[in-house]
């Protein structure tokens, strides 16, 4: 469960960071 939450947060952070950087 903890891994799932971290994975989702990581994906959100990566997607937000990539969108802002692009």
Curated annotation (Swiss-Prot):
A Gene Ontology annotation in the biological process aspect, one of them, is: L-leucine biosynthetic process
Instruction: Name the keywords, alphabetized.
Output: Amino-acid biosynthesis, Branched-chain amino acid biosynthesis, Leader peptide, Leucine biosynthesis
Q: Where is the composition biased (Low complexity)?
A: 11-22
Q: Which segments carry the region annotation Disordered?
A: 1-22
Q: What does this protein do?
A: Involved in control of the biosynthesis of leucine.
Name the UniProt record assigns to this protein: leu leader peptide
Query: What is the phylogenetic placement of the source species in the record?
Result: Bacteria, Bacillati, Actinomycetota, Actinomycetes, Mycobacteriales
- Its gene is leuL
